[in-house]
Amino acid sequence: IQGSKYIDLRLECMKQLEKIGYNGFIIANGDALLTNPRELVEVVTSLKKESKKSSYFIFSFAELSFMPILTYMGIDGFLADSANYYSHLNVLQTPTKAYDLNTYPIYDDITQKELEEKNIENMEFTIKEIHAHMKNNSLRNLVEERSGTTPQNISTLKILDKTQMDYLLEYTKLF
């Protein structure tokens, strides 16, 4: 769903696609949204509120530490290609942090392919962790735990709690 920072364009794009039978949507510019917590919250919650119940949303290029809060907000899936994307940037994705290996040389002589495999493995773990917390009705706990990993993550949670409490009560289990 394109539209940049213009939420009304994203909503119109989604509604027109729903009219012609689409129900799966990839939110464009995911990596840019992660750096702007207010816009991230506005885009995701607006799309979820205005979509049909049968629609699902996929977030592109999500950092692993953001996956719990994105799921909590209503994102239904993530692109596995983000592991490849971040490996080309020489970034190791872990459940709590994204490490630029040029700055943090955690692994010596790791190839891009090996880095992609590690990123996929960590993504699979993060998804399993999210599923386990969902089954145990403790996703909010995981969200709060991960919110401390980056300033953008904690800002996203604070903005979500402050501006979208009605949305959270309607669409999520708080604990």
Model-assigned labels for residue ranges:
Residues I106-F175:
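C-terminal extensions of enzymes
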Residues I1-E114:
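Glycine-rich phosphate/ribose-binding loops and adjacent secondary-structure elements
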